[in-house]
Amino acid sequence: MNTNESALLIEIENYILEIYNRKSKPKDFYDDLSRLLIEFNGIYNSDYSYFGCIEAFVELLRELNICLGCQGELAQQLKNLSFKYIQCRFEFYVSRHKRKLRDHRYSENENTAQLVKRMRTVSQRYSRILVVRLDLAYKKKYHHSVDIADFDNDMRILRQRIHNQDGIFKGLIEYAWALEQGTEKGYHCHLLLVYKGHEHKNAYGIAERVSEIWKKITFNQGCYFNCHSPEYLNQFEEQGTLGIGMIHRNDPDQVGNMLKAIQYLVRPEKEEQYLRVKVCKRMRTFG
């Protein structure tokens, strides 16, 4: 695959939202539309589930008898459809998009509440817990070769390792993960791991070992961010808001900061980070 699937889907979504809000036809409307349609056709998979606005392009591919081999020819054929007609088509899918975003926000709120409940229970059960946070993604130079199927497969392997408590995951008492898609990071995962504090003490070291597993799973295409690097932690320590690392049950401030920090995994405000495509409708994005 030579197309950056993640970036293209975000570009298409932004394009549809822009056209929906336009008062008049943009100068290069048909050229831009034909280019995006051809590029989308190159990555389109009928088995996948596309989010909101992207469905407008799926329907254009299905319904219009158009030539997708040449951008110039396609642009000419698209001119048979008025700007207002296409804009009205987009309007229908933008409305569906907004409804799905509301559903997404509700689901994320539910996930947040469940995670906070789980972590509050864990913090009450043990005198101290080690909360480990890291983000897993792909190096930018490989974004063009990683699609949603690759991301889903890599995450399935990682989750199986976690579930089996294999290696560094031995002794886990809680964990959570959230799959997202961003303009800069592409497909990525926020990962939370929780251990008994009397058995593990080095959160930075654990995150580093997990990152090595991620690199192996992705054949060295993966990258990571260790949330326990001193530079990153210092800003929270200075503000008195540090909520990862060693958390003591008898320190209400630490527990409170921890419960706030873990909400970042599924924070509803990060709406632009949702997946625009899933390998199937039931593909999980949080657990």
Regions found by a protein language model. Name each.
Residues R35-N41, Y48-L74, V94-R125, G197-G287:
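Catalytic "initiation/cleavage/transfer" segments centered on a nucleophilic residue
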Residues D135-A137, E180, P268:
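Structured loops at beta-to-helix junctions and adjacent beta-edge loops in soluble globular domains
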Residues E174-H198:
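Histidine-centered divalent-metal-coordination microenvironment in nucleic-acid enzymes
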Residues K139-H143, V194-E199:
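A short, flexible beta-alpha/helix-coil linker loop
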Residues M1-Y85:
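Extended repeat-based interaction scaffolds and adjacent low-complexity, acidic/S/T/P-biased segments
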